[in-house]
Amino acid sequence: MHEITLSQRALEIIEQQAQQAGARRVTGVWLKVGAFSCVEASALTFCFELVCRGTLAEGCELHIAEQQAECWCERCQQYVHLVSQHVRRCPLCNNDQLQIVADDGLQIQRLELE
């Protein structure tokens, strides 16, 4: 379960940003998870709540959005979006030789601080 490691790393960054801003508390966190990142939203939520105990982010509201994977199709020379790691064909030309160019794992999109 790599969600615990992702949660720990995200919390380190969140706490650093909160401290730099002089915040007393983190009340909201918005994360973006890549479609091919193999991150389970429910496991991430559980792990995030666990690692936040006793920190500035304890009790914060966690928002998770899934990012579509962006791929480059050599055949039709277009960027395309895929929503499932199980369907890896270009929706425009049905080519199966796609290069994934953006599926950024986990990104912190926004923080709400007090």
UniProtKB/Swiss-Prot annotation:
InterPro entries: Hydgase_Ni_incorp_HypA/HybF_CS (IPR020538), HypA/HybF (IPR000688). Ni(2+) binds at H2. Zn(2+) binds at C73, C76, C90, C93. Keywords: Metal-binding, Nickel, Zinc. One of its GO terms (molecular function) is nickel cation binding. Pfam families: HypA. GO terms for biological process: protein maturation; protein modification process. Involved in the maturation of [NiFe] hydrogenases. Required for nickel insertion into the metal center of the hydrogenase. Belongs to the HypA/HybF family. HAMAP family: HypA_HybF. This is Hydrogenase maturation factor HypA.
